[in-house]
Swiss-Prot record:
Binds specifically to the neurotoxin saxitoxin. Its physiological role may be to transport or sequester an endogenous organic molecule other than Fe(3+). It may participate in a detoxification mechanism for neutralizing a microbial toxin. It comes from Aquarana catesbeiana (American bullfrog). PANTHER family: SEROTRANSFERRIN (PTHR11485:SF31), TRANSFERRIN (PTHR11485). This is Saxiphilin. Residues 26-106, 245-482, 492-828 form the Transferrin-like domain.
Length: 844
């Protein structure tokens, strides 16, 4: 057994032997002996309660990805280019923690100054002390001199508080943060994290940036010195923002650059035939960004991966190279690793990584080095400079003006389906709080993480490689590897959300003449992600999923039309219509309960279809909060049944679980195991216990006048119920069009913007064949489901109508201003989700 593996095994056994019998473990995969040494240092020095770090050694990035896939390790850090490769078969890994960078500054000023001080490694140097949120500790002490003093929120020394060692220290008070930073911290954390909440942008002094941007809605606006919006500056997404002031925003991106010696004289368009040094073949900054620019500028002769691998093409472009991880002999000739380790995609190759690429250039093994801007140092500016794609050269500190593009920071990855994600997150967040040496090491540069890292940030659980990298970069990487396949303009790949839908879709595909193909996801969100990635083209979504889809950039192409009393729009496209025939959300009461109206429902007993449902929860809750200063719904009603709520809360008191199986403990379950769940359940709740039920208007007609034979419903009459109107009056249930809480927008077929015309054309053709009046409706029916209900389309759909896009904000255009104002006006975060958080990552 080799000594390095004996050492690795020893440390692994030691770390396991000291772990408690039931202690949780995070097995970190190290790609080299140097990374293993750093990992073992952390095992001994970074003690996180209840979670043990275990180091697993493999010989390369690819071997570590395999180990994680096979369950032999749990996590590793990858460059953004490697994240793409890891996301594919056979690895199927996903990013869970991001590594944000700061180009000039970071909002956590204390963390930045601390990192800079640690990087200098100067004996006797003052190192700021920061709290777990990245703020300055009120009292600062110099580790070498022993002097202590008080600071304000911005880290500035407070006059008269300096005390030498041995004397009683001044009492330091925690100073109030500037208003912007305080609001930012509340938005980002606090006791109650709300996804989609607006997070203010602050400058390094804690003042409001002149231009503010809402990460979820895409709106931007200008503010004054105290953060108040300046009238007339609000700009919707897709429009050019108002000019407030030039900014240098904090970014989670870095720059890919080309570094050369000043003594050389060639320009970017003269790279062919030169000797090259690269950080690695899987790296974005040292390889993929360069290839993309060379192809775009037509400097590289390459007919695509179908005819020739990109490595083969690049081996003919450069004379010789060192590209760790490459398979072409010519691309490894300049590497200097020992036998068996030469050109390895790990630190075992001395020229691996950003600092390795620089070393390759420095040792005159190459004419140009392709690496990341964070590896640049002012101390090299006398000898080196940047090679710019516009055929100029610039100083090293001008990397923002002279680069090959911006690319995302790397991430920590684990298995897509893993029970270790929470442990990994908890370990790294706690290690960060305890100021463990995650981001530096005496053993070398960029081990486990990049040395330029200031902090780690958890990603939304919905984030995958596509959502993290963004559309442009993801598809660029697919093109380089031959994974890209342009969708056909004559075929729609329809996404189905369950097995029954897939069966119906397959039947449709068989008679479509090749116009329809079928994909399958496990839920509507899965279909949204498939369409975003280009793996599917269309899906029909109910309104509760439309907000997420629109926030993620999809657009409605076609809408369902349900009004069977007016078939005109189906016969003649473009005919005017005012009623889609869709549902209305109503507040239903017993006619005998004369004293209740909309204005006095506080304290009453309420029945809801389920938490998150549009008619039974989102609309009534949004209205109540708007009209009652954001009242807490838990305490607004006397008692409720809102399936899906905390079982100990007031919102579950009226629920009864499963009357046929009281031992099942399903009270308040968001499923039919709660008798009061869903539309029928909420109506039953009203009949048996409640004062008001929030339901779609059709519920009363479907469960009265002999329509429902159940014991609790068989004798009910529709005339025994009334509607509560928002003006305080009441009305018969037949007046649902005028006495409602809100209309509900129709379901829509969504797709990518560039695919709208193709989807509309193909769907119109299929409807002419298999719609209600279709020529071939005896062969197949779009709006009928003999294997279930409402499959692919709602069964009461009369026809599909092209969405009439108006030149306004897409949210108001689809939802309609009344609905949009009702649901989102009071709190835009009301419908936020992990998917929206993932979709609204600011990409490079």
């Amino acid at each position: 057994m080799a000594p390095t593996f004996q050492t690795a095994l020893f440390f692994t056994i030691i770390s396991l032997s000291f772990a408690a019998p039931n202690a949780k473990q995070v097995r970190w995969c190290a790609i080299s002996d140097l990374e293993q040494k750093k990992c073992n240092d952390l095992v001994g020095s970074c003690n996180v309660p209840d979670i043990t770090l275990v180091c697993v050694l493999r010989s390369s990035t690819e071997d570590c990805m395999t180990a994680i896939k096979d369950g032999q390790a749990d996590a590793m850090f990858l460059d953004s280019g490697e994240v793409y490769e890891a996301s594919k078969d056979p690895y199927n890994l996903k990013p869970i923690i991001a590594e944000p960078y700061s180009s000039n500054r970071d909002l956590q000023k204390c963390l930045k100054e601390r990192q800079q001080a640690l990087a200098k490694k100067m004996i006797g140097h003052y190192i700021p002390q920061c709290d777990e949120k990245g703020n300055y500790q009120p009292q600062q002490c110099h580790g070498s001199t022993g002097h202590c003093w008080c600071v304000n929120a911005m880290g500035e020394k407070i006059s008269g508080t300096n005390t030498p060692p041995g004397q009683t220290r001044a009492t330091c008070e925690r100073h109030e943060l500037p208003k912007c930073l305080k609001e930012r911290q509340v938005a980002l954390g606090g006791d109650e994290k709300v996804l989609g909440r607006f997070v203010p942008q602050c400058d390094e002094k804690g003042n409001y940036e002149p231009q503010q941007f809402h990460g979820s809605t895409g709106y931007s606006w200008c503010v004054n010195a105290i953060g108040e919006e300046i009238a007339g500056t609000k700009t919707p997404p897709g429009k050019i923002p108002a000019t407030c002031q030039k900014h240098d925003l904090v970014t989670t991106c870095h720059y890919a650059v080309a570094m050369v010696k000043k003594s050389s004289a060639f320009q970017f368009n003269q790279l062919k035939g030169k000797r090259s040094c690269h950080s690695g073949v899987s790296k974005t900054d040292g390889w993929k960004a360069l290839v993309t620019v060379l192809v775009e500028k037509k400097l590289l002769s390459w007919d695509g991966p179908a005819k020739e691998s990109i490595q083969r093409a690049m081996s003919k472009f450069f004379s010789v190279s060192c590209i760790p991880g490459a398979t072409q002999t010519n691309l490894c000739k300049q590497c200097k690793g020992e036998e068996g380790k030469n050109c390895k995609n790990s630190h075992d190759e001395p020229y691996y990584g950003n600092y390795g690429a620089f070393r390759c250039l420095k040792e005159d093994m190459g004419d140009v080095a392709f690496l990341r801007s964070t590896a640049l140092s002012d101390e090299h500016s006398e000898v080196y400079e940047l090679l710019c794609p516009d055929n100029t050269r610039k100083p090293l500190n001008k990397y923002k003006e002279c680069n090959l593009g911006t690319v995302p920071a790397g991430t920590v990855v684990t298995r897509k389906i893993s029970d270790k994600t929470e442990d990994i997150n908890n370990f790294l967040m706690e290690a960060q709080k305890r100021q463990c040496k995650l981001f530096s090491s005496a053993h070398g540069k960029d081990l486990m993480f990049d040395d330029s890292t200031l902090q780690l940030a958890l990603l939304s659980s919905e984030v995958d490689a596509f959502l993290y990298l963004g559309v442009k970069l993801f598809h660029a990487m697919k093109a380089l590897t031959g994974d890209a396949h342009l969708p056909s303009k004559n075929k729609v790949r329809w996404c189905t959300i369950n097995k029954l839908e897939k069966m119906k879709c397959d039947d449709w595909s068989a008679v479509s003449g090749g116009a329809i193909a079928c994909t399958e996801a496990s839920c509507p969100k899965g279909c949204v992600k498939q369409i975003l990635k280009g793996e599917a083209d269309a899906v029909k979504l109910e309104v509760q999923y439309m907000y997420e889809a629109l926030m993620c950039g999809l657009l409605p192409a076609v809408e369902e039309y349900h009004n069977k009393d007016d078939f005109g729009p189906c016969k003649t496209p473009g005919s005017p219509y005012t009623d889609f025939g869709t549902l209305r959300a109503v507040a239903l009461v017993k006619k005998s309960n004369k004293d209740i109206n909309w204005n006095n429902i506080k304290g009453k007993k309420s029945c809801h279809t389920g938490v998150g449902d549009i008619a039974g929860w989102v609309i009534p809750v949004s209205l109540i909060r708007r009209q009652n200063d954001n009242s807490d719904i838990d305490s607004f009603f006397g008692e409720s049944c809102a399936p899906g709520s905390d079982t100990k809360s007031n919102l579950c008191k009226l629920c009864i679980g499963d009357p046929k199986n009281s031992a099942a403990n399903t009270k308040c379950s968001l499923s039919d195991k709660e008798a009061y769940y869903g539309n029928q359940g909420a109506f039953r709740c009203l009949v048996e216990k409640g004062d008001v039920a929030f339901v779609p208007h059709t519920v009363v007609f479907e469960n009265t006048d002999g329509k429902n034979p159940a014991v609790w419903a068989k004798n009910l009459k529709s005339e025994d119920f009334e509607l509560l109107c928002l003006d305080g009056s009441r009305a018969p249930v037949s007046n649902y069009k005028s006495c409602k809480l809100s209309g509900i927008p129709p379901p829509a077929i969504v797709t990518r913007e560039e695919s709208i015309s193709d989807v509309v054309r193909i769907v119109a053709n299929q409807q002419s064949l298999y719609g209600r009046k279709g020529f071939e409706k005896d062969m197949f029916q779009l709006f009928s489901s003999n294997k279930g209900n409402n499959l692919l389309f709602n069964d009461n759909t009369q026809c599909l109508i092209t969405f009439d896009r108006q030149p306004k904000d897409i949210m108001e255009d689809y939802f309609g201003k009344p609905y949009y104002t009702t649901v989102y006006g009071a709190s835009r975060s009301a419908m936020s989700s992990e998917l929206i958080s993932a979709c609204t990552i600011k990409h490079c």
